[in-house]
Amino acid sequence: MSSPPQGSSLASPVQAAAVTGDKTTLLKLIASSPEVIDQEDQLGRTPLMYSVLGDRRSCAEALLKHGAQVNHPDRSGRTALHLAAQTGNHRLLKLLLSRKADCTHRDLRDITAVHLSTRHQDTRCLALILKYTPPGQVDAQDQRKQTALHWSAYYNRPRHVRLLVRHGSNIGIPDTEGKIPLHWAAGHKDPEAALTVRCLLEAAPTESLLNWQDYEGRTPLHLAVGDGNQEVVRLLTSYRGCNVAPYDNLFRTPLHWAALLGYTPIAHLLLETNNSPNIPSDSQGATPLHYAAQGNCPDTVRVLLSHISVRDEADLEGRTAFMWAAGKGSDEVVRTMLELDPELEVNRTDKYGGTALHAASLSGQITTVRILLENRVQVDAVDVMKHTALFRACEMGHREVISTLIKGGAKVHLVDKDGRSPLHWAALGGNANVCQILIENNINPDAQDYEGRTPLQCAAYGGYIGCMEVLMENKADPNIQDKNGRTALHWSCNNGYLDAVKLLLGYSAFPNQMENTEERYTPLDYALLGGHQEVIQFMLEHGALSIAAIQDIAASKIQAVYKGHKVRRAFQERKNLLMKHEQLRKGAAAKKREGENRQKGKVGQTEGKQKDENHVMRQDKSNEHIQNEVMREWYGEETGRAEDRKEEHQEENQNIEPKQLKHSKHMEQNSKSIAKNQKRAGHIQSSPIEHVHTNSIQTRMSPSRTSISHSSPLGNETPKNMYWDDNPTQNNTQPRRTSRPQIESPNIIVHRIEDLVQKESRRKSHREERKGSHRQRASSHHRLQASERETAGSVIHGEVEFKKKETKKGRRTAAGTSKIRASGEAGRLSQSEKEFSSTGIQGRVDCITSPESCETPSRVCRERKMISAKSGQRPLTETQSPEKACQGSSALKPSLTSHTKQTAIASKCLDSTPSYIGFGEAIKPLTPMGILREGSFSSKWQNIDIELIPLEARLQLVEKEKARKQLFQRKKHAATVIQKAWRTYCIRKSSRKTRHSHLRNNPRAMV
């Protein structure tokens, strides 16, 4: 047989005939088309099912006779037997069972025909199905694990329960909620449910069934109390094994549920059957009294308080039943408790310091607040947050409670732990009317908390326009900043409240106020971070700037100010430099004048010394002349003239080699007289012995002058009676002429001496005239020599002073005695260098002005030795004299020019040349400007005085050095700015994401 067509319409003729009972039409349709006998509609139902639903027994019999499938399921999995059991049609049910219908067939929810047969009062269907049901299928469970016995208890079918129990149904099978049939029977509100409970308990009156707990920990007694079925409660508590105070998963007993639901008789019944002296508390520490007070059940509260074991104990939060009643507005319970206990602690605090008045104010229970104020409650009691009842009422916006509290003496100027006033909490809640009430009670609209936030900022954070308008109408300042520099406009832009932004700008809020954090954000920056396009557009139209734009403007102004500062600083530095130069110039001039005065004193001392020496020399010459006259008498006139010339020659050598003079004792006396003159003039430099030593050094270190004074007055002629006597101990390297006299008798010698004495007296006047002209030439020579020394001393003075300073700097940490000794040595060194320099100049003058001597190798050698000695090399010793170094050269030639002419030419050559510069350098002297143009100082000019460098050259060097340092500083500053900007950009980028996500996920972050 082919399967019937699927998806037929409900209005198919065969199905219509089956439901209406038109058997004739049904048979015709079956005869014409046999496949329509099991045709399904959209619900999957066949004509047989429709005949069962329509209670058409004849049609059902005809369909079954023509071969209709009795166990064909519909879309829900149910067969015709399910429909017959559901409707309670006993006749059709019997017909189907006779045609071998399956009574154990389950639909999609695992429901069998046995489950469905318990829905009706008639037990015939159940009995018929149980007759055809196999023994193990009586307790078949549906998807909720419920058996037919569960269904019978739920529908309160005591006869069905007895029938199922008789057929062996198990009363202890739990369903998906852990409930057994006794739970469903006890939880029924019908008073006749006690009969069903009795039927179940008669089947198995065990203690385990009485105290069976479902998956929520509830026993049948919990469910009976919860439904308020007093008969079932009395029945259950009548059994000895029943636990009157079992705990559920919330640690609540049946008494808790009775008090919570206000079942006073059941509560009284449970208290009577409870043998425990203590009333247990639940998981929150609440007793049945708490729940009775919360539910405003004064009778239950009265019953509970009348029991000896019930007391008003605090829960885990420290709240009593009285606080619970005040918080819920249970005025009758509050009055009842105050009536039953006149000494009740109305100001008792909970764990957080809150009182019953706090609880009533928070929930806005105006009647309860008035009752509490009438019973000696403290109106300004504070909790741990320093909140009074007024704070709670302002936060929730209960105007009547606020007015009642203020009339009851509540203070409006108190602040909490965070420095917030009641106006802050009213603004955070957006309660404009409450703000108006508080302002009318003289509260400050610009009050700031400990973070610097005002009520206006709190209202702007939530975007409460009405509250903001009330505050600003009462002269609240919109430009007040908190500790982070944020204003109300910052908060409105951050949360994107366009109306709040418009209102703030309308009340003259500054749009470019920067915060005090590192980012220095403006309100526009917050709008940009939040991506609020409308707020951004409106802010830009009203002149708002971002921090980047403000920094650009500030940078341009800072640069202008910095440029002006640089100009002023450069001018000040130039001015300081010029003033310093002027001070240096004046100091140099003062030092120069001091040096000139010192040189003048030395020249005067030198002239006095020369006069004393000339006086001694004249006395010696007179004695020597007598001896020469005697020698002429002995050896002849020519020998006498030669001795005269030798005497004149030796007279000149007395200034060069004082150790070989015969009158050294007279020189010591002369030195003492010179020292006395210096002491009177105040320029004593050293002892008389040191003067003699210095003069000897000058004589030894002037080879040119020695060579001139040693030149033979006879030219190249040498007398025959002369011989060479080389004495290595003497400084003079010229060969000494000595004669070999013949021995005569003493009488002849005495007579001749007497004659010579007479002749000497006659010649004295002639010799004085000749000596006068010689002294005139000597005095002019000494004046030229003094001028040369002064010129050389002025050049070397700067170098000597520089060396003195360097010596003193290197010895700052030495002892006091070492400093004195070092300064004395430096003074002697300076005096020696000056005298040495003047001697060296005189030697070079002789070399320059004598053409023959310049060509002589010995002169060149002496000049080189002198330069090497000046430049720091080892000086020439007596064994290394210039003459010995040049022994292979020709003999010295006499000078062709006079001494006066030589000194004049030398003074012109050495006007601007230091004493240690050689002949070649003296011809083309170096100048400081030439050195500066070359770009570096020569080693010979490193110790030159700063005064010799022109002012323009010094300023040029200073400017170059300053420009180099400024360029380095600008590069370093630019690198630092770039690094700092990059770090700031990275920090900003990461903080923006964090802040934005934090503010979006936590809208109350500000509070």
Curated annotation (Swiss-Prot):
Record localization: Cytoplasm; Cytoplasm, Cytoskeleton
Organism: Xenopus laevis (African clawed frog)
Domain of life: Eukaryota
Entry protein name: Inversin-A
GO cellular component term of the entry, any: cytoplasm
Quaternary structure and partners: Interacts with apc2. Binds calmodulin.
One GO BP: Wnt signaling pathway
Principal subcellular localization: cytoplasm
